[in-house]
Structures are given as C-alpha cells and as structure tokens.
C-alpha cells in the first residue's frame, strides 16, 4: 500500500520562496522530490477544499495555476467540509493552532493520511497521535 500524504500550502509554495537560505533551499528540493514520487504514483496525495481555497488567494497567478494543476492532476482524494472535520478542527484550534491550519490537519486526519508534511514550525511543534506531522526533508530521509 502506498503511503498517503497531505502537503500543506507552505510546502506547495516553498520552491517559490527565496532560495538563498539553506533551509528553504533544502525544503524546496525535498518538496520537489516528493512531487516526483507523487507523479510516479509512489505516494498517494490527499488535498482538501482548504488547499484549493488558500491557493486561490495566492497573488502570483503563474504559481497559483501551477499548484492547482498539480493538485487536480495527482490528488487521489479531495476532502470536503463535514461535521467530523469541523469537530477535529475545533479540538486542534483549542491547542492554539490557527483555524486554516487546523482544517488542513483535520482533513489529513479524516482521510487517514500517514503523514502531514509542512514547513511551518508552529505546526511541526503540534503533537497528536492521529497523524505524523513532518518536515519534507525529514520525510525524504525517513523514506530511504
């Protein structure tokens, strides 16, 4: 069975960030490698309505369209709003995670993803037994 992953919007946008910082550059390379694995169908990609909503707010049209096209082409599931997700989100928000980030996490948990991949340090500090939260670099290292 292929690992099922959820990439948050920080990951999708990481290759468009300033690559002069080593951490950003390494995270970008790891994220692009993850995209290749998704394209080769080695990994299963889960998205959500929040993924599309946040991406629609990206001011760079070229980046917005590229990200949207990748998600549409490769997603195996797009999680939509439902009471279970709202309940999970509420629990996560109560720990101090922002609402949009909590919706992403709740969507990944609802879809039974193996990993939630993010570059956001605040989310990386969040702990739950429901899903593994991991940086793209660490994800690649552990896949070996």
Where are these regions (language model features)?
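Conserved beta-strand segments of alpha/beta enzyme cores
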Residues: 44, 75-77, 132
